[in-house]
Amino acid sequence: MKLKEKIEAIRLRKLGKSYGEIRKKARVSKGTLSLWLRNIELTPGQEKRLYVELRQKNAYRMAKLNQRKRIDKTKKILKEAKKEVSSYFTNPLFLAGLMLYWAEGDKSEEDELVKFSNSDPAMIKLMMRWFGEICKVPEEKFRITLYIHELFCRKDIEKYWSKLTKIPLAQFHKTQVKPTSLRHRKNPLYNGTCAIRISNRDLFRRIKGWKLGFLEKINIRMKENNMPS
């Protein structure tokens, strides 16, 4: 029997150390350690500390596991999306929507929210088609937020954008109202800014993959034609 290790293990357990902490000092099997320490009772304070530490370690391990899964999933989506570009490359709607989102869409990776804002009705109509036909977003997943100036009729503007986007008002977030400037007072055709929102991280990553795939495709063609990239 490893008497020296046993004495040290008992001493550490009485100090409230966990089995994992003790095994780093007394290098014996978990079964042997359990046998040595089975009659040692911890104080309520020691039990609470070990319980809190265990929860923290488990939470950290779970967070790292989820992070790894998220990274792997993102890599897979990006890879698949980049491959899809070849089949979409001659589709005018795909290219127009991708370019518009690239220029005007939300690209923040903090919340990975798909968002496109514009005051031009034609651009909003095109992007609604793009999200529906290319991205396959079902109607019930769309959310709309309007930004208008206080002088104008909120209800009329909400109805206008609801009709244009074909999204029911029940899927509109609260309209954001700003003070009216002199410039907007003179504009009878003013309808504010419409923000299309889609809470879908996979779609956000897919669009990013399309952009990367498009760039790769362009660079390849430029090299084939001896053009500087």
Language-model segments: residues:
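Short alpha-helical "recognition helix" segments of helix-turn-helix
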Residues: 21-26
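Structural motif
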Residues: 85-96
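C-terminal regulatory/effector modules of DNA-binding transcriptional regulators
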Residues: 138, 143, 148-229
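Intrinsically disordered, low-complexity basic tails/linkers immediately adjacent to helix-turn-helix/homeobox/MYB/SANT
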Residues: 49-84
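Short secondary-structure subsegments characteristic of cysteine-rich extracellular domains
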Residues: 109-134
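Residue-level detection of the helix-turn-helix DNA-binding "recognition helix"
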Residues: 14, 27, 38-42
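Short, amphipathic alpha-helical "recognition" segments used to contact nucleic acids or chromatin
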Residues: 2-17
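Short, solvent-exposed alpha-helical "recognition" segments
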Residues: 1-2, 32-54
